[in-house]
């Protein structure tokens, strides 16, 4: 396993524990990073498309995540720690940007190849991990949506 993958946040909710989208308070702010403006139209298009498939939702997180060649992320669960935890309320999607058939997303003891050109929903409260056995860096756009 490598030290850490790298990421470029575009839009990010600052508070993961007590996130309540219908309230505005210091713990509930969504940060818009400078890079967001470069992809705002595309993110809106993606969100509208997912609205038509899964119903309306607010896009609250968007981040590009790079997993270096030969690296991985150990299996883990993004465990809700309380009733208001963000992971118990959102739906997470992976959109492969650069990938390889030797990059494996493992979820509940099954390996998957997430192919470029598709959108995948990941229930991240379930056991999951990833390993990049290829010789290229993998890049995904990962978004979290909060259903209305």
Language-model features: locations:
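Short, small-residue-biased leader/transition segments that mark boundaries at the very start
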Residues: 1-3
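Conserved double-stranded beta-helix
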Residues: 9-98
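Extracellular structured ligand-interaction cores
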Residues: 59-61, 90-94, 102, 127, ...
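Short beta-strand His + acidic residue motifs that chelate non-heme Fe in jelly-roll/DSBH
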Residues: 76, 103-105, 122-123, 127-135
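Short, surface-exposed beta-strand-loop junctions and turns on beta-sheet-rich folds
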Residues: 81, 111-113, 137
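A short beta-strand-loop-beta hairpin characteristic of the jelly-roll/cupin
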Residues: 90, 96-116
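A short hydrophobic beta-strand segment most commonly corresponding to one strand
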Residues: 91-96, 119-121, 135-148
């Amino acid at each position: 396993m490598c030290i850490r993958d790298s990421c470029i946040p575009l839009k990010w909710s600052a508070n993961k524990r007590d996130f309540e989208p219908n309230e505005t308070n210091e713990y509930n702010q969504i940060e818009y990073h400078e890079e967001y403006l470069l992809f705002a139209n595309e993110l809106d298009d993606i969100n509208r498309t997912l609205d038509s498939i899964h119903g309306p939702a607010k896009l609250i997180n968007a981040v590009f995540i790079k997993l270096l060649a030969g690296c991985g992320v150990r299996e883990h669960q993004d465990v809700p720690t309380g009733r208001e935890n963000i992971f118990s309320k959102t739906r997470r999607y992976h959109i492969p940007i650069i990938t390889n058939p030797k990059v494996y997303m493992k979820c509940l003891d099954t390996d998957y190849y997430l192919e470029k050109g598709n959108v995948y929903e990941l229930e991240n409260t379930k056991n999951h991990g990833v390993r990049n056995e290829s010789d290229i860096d993998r890049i995904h756009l990962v978004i979290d949506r909060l259903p209305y």
